[in-house]
Amino acid sequence: CLSPIGDTLIKKGLMHVLEGLRPEYYATPVTRSPKAVNGNPFIIEAGIVYGGDIPSDGPVQILRFANRVPLLYQQGACAITKAISELDWRRYGLEQRGGKGIPYGPAIIMVHIASTKVPFTSEGKEAVASLPEIMSEIGLALRLCARNLKSHLNKMERKKKTHAKFEIVQEILPDMAQKAAQQLGRPVPNLDRTITKIMNV
């Protein structure tokens, strides 16, 4: 019987564990439909957390789980790490040298594989084997999470530009209105409606 964590518990778990880092964004967790490898069913789940006090000057942190148990060793030999490295994260707002390898930035990537028989690389059960079916499913789950992250980053960029535009308008327009009013010998008009129209709000 497969035992996925589920979207709600993934988000709650990440929020609880990472509370001290105060991330600004939790991408909607992804739970893929069951697939099979070597006759054994498996499910891939993924989540991404971004911003806040997560360090931005180093590689992203990777949280790997198999049947709800954290995988703490042999990260480089694991299918989860390899799938993360193969995705072009530059398209989704993270830095990545040459479009391959572990991305850099203020993010934490979590991947969980639930299976009746997880294909580990060794008896130590520290890394998941890089089988094509598993790599493909991890990649698809990560892309969905990464798209959500990119949407958030685009939204934040638009907010930033709107705020900068508002600051410029607030600074320049009153000065222009005052000079024009002086030249025409009229009182300075109320600019609230004009600023609202310019800002499209």
Residues of each region from the PLM?
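Glycine/threonine-rich ATP-lid/beta-loop region of ATP-binding domains
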Residues: C1-G52
